[in-house]
């Protein structure tokens, strides 16, 4: 498993991809609307400005392929658009929460390098003691296994002697 910083970087990359996909979906699937309340504002005038020649040609090609949409189909399309936006928003929220959890798991700014080294040293000592305990348990298991084998041999020998 990757360390927390690598996980955090991966999650941030995924979040950027989700933002990009969401903005792209909105740009390609939504109906144009005013950017603010004032229709004479600079942003609305710029948004309603005519497209450059090459984009106009592409738009006319796309426009000629479009068919008239019935009101029920348009309502379904709007519902589908809203559902997709809700799903994309939920994905972004979940990824943001995952990033927050990863950030919370990182050592704080107030944690000095010395205290981090002390924590690592303590964990290393704890690991060594657990490994020693594991070795002892393995030796105990081997001892019990040999004892069980000797009991089985004694029982088998006793049974064979009683049959002769």
Curated annotation (Swiss-Prot):
<dbReference type="InterPro" id="IPR021384">
    <property type="entry name" value="Mediator_Med21"/>
</dbReference>
<dbReference type="GO" id="GO:0070847">
    <property type="term" value="C:core mediator complex"/>
</dbReference>
<dbReference type="GO" id="GO:0016592">
    <property type="term" value="C:mediator complex"/>
</dbReference>
<dbReference type="InterPro" id="IPR037212">
    <property type="entry name" value="Med7/Med21-like"/>
</dbReference>
<feature type="region of interest" description="Disordered">
    <location>
        <begin position="49"/>
        <end position="81"/>
    </location>
</feature>
<dbReference type="GO" id="GO:0003714">
    <property type="term" value="F:transcription corepressor activity"/>
</dbReference>
<dbReference type="GO" id="GO:0060261">
    <property type="term" value="P:positive regulation of transcription initiation by RNA polymerase II"/>
</dbReference>
<comment type="function">
    <text>Component of the Mediator complex, a coactivator involved in the regulated transcription of nearly all RNA polymerase II-dependent genes. Mediator functions as a bridge to convey information from gene-specific regulatory proteins to the basal RNA polymerase II transcription machinery. Mediator is recruited to promoters by direct interactions with regulatory proteins and serves as a scaffold for the assembly of a functional preinitiation complex with RNA polymerase II and the general transcription factors.</text>
</comment>
<keyword id="KW-0539">Nucleus</keyword>
<keyword id="KW-0805">Transcription regulation</keyword>
<keyword id="KW-0175">Coiled coil</keyword>
<dbReference type="GO" id="GO:0000122">
    <property type="term" value="P:negative regulation of transcription by RNA polymerase II"/>
</dbReference>
<dbReference type="Pfam" id="PF11221">
    <property type="entry name" value="Med21"/>
</dbReference>
<feature type="coiled-coil region">
    <location>
        <begin position="114"/>
        <end position="146"/>
    </location>
</feature>
<keyword id="KW-0010">Activator</keyword>
<dbReference type="GO" id="GO:0061629">
    <property type="term" value="F:RNA polymerase II-specific DNA-binding transcription factor binding"/>
</dbReference>
<dbReference type="GO" id="GO:0051123">
    <property type="term" value="P:RNA polymerase II preinitiation complex assembly"/>
</dbReference>
<protein>
    <recommendedName>
        <fullName>Mediator of RNA polymerase II transcription subunit 21</fullName>
    </recommendedName>
</protein>
<comment type="similarity">
    <text>Belongs to the Mediator complex subunit 21 family.</text>
</comment>
<dbReference type="GO" id="GO:0032968">
    <property type="term" value="P:positive regulation of transcription elongation by RNA polymerase II"/>
</dbReference>
<dbReference type="GO" id="GO:0003713">
    <property type="term" value="F:transcription coactivator activity"/>
</dbReference>
<feature type="compositionally biased region" description="Polar residues">
    <location>
        <begin position="53"/>
        <end position="81"/>
    </location>
</feature>
<comment type="subunit">
    <text>Component of the Mediator complex.</text>
</comment>
<keyword id="KW-0804">Transcription</keyword>
């Amino acid at each position: 498993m990757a360390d927390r910083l690598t996980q955090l970087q991966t999650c941030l990359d995924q979040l950027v991809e989700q933002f990009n996909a969401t903005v792209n979906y909105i740009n390609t699937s939504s109906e144009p609307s005013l950017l603010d309340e004032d229709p004479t504002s600079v942003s609305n005038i710029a948004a309603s400005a005519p497209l450059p020649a090459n984009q106009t040609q592409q738009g006319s090609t796309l426009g000629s392929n479009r068919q008239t949409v019935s009101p029920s189909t348009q309502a379904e399309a709007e519902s589908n658009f809203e559902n997709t936006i809700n799903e994309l928003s939920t994905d972004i929220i979940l990824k943001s929460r995952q990033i927050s959890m990863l950030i919370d798991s990182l050592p704080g700014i107030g944690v000095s390098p010395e205290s981090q080294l002390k924590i690592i040293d303590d964990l290393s000592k704890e690991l060594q003691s657990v490994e020693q305990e594991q070795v002892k348990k393995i030796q105990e298991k081997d001892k019990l296994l040999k004892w069980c084998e000797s009991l089985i041999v004694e029982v088998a020998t006793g049974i064979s002697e009683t049959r002769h």
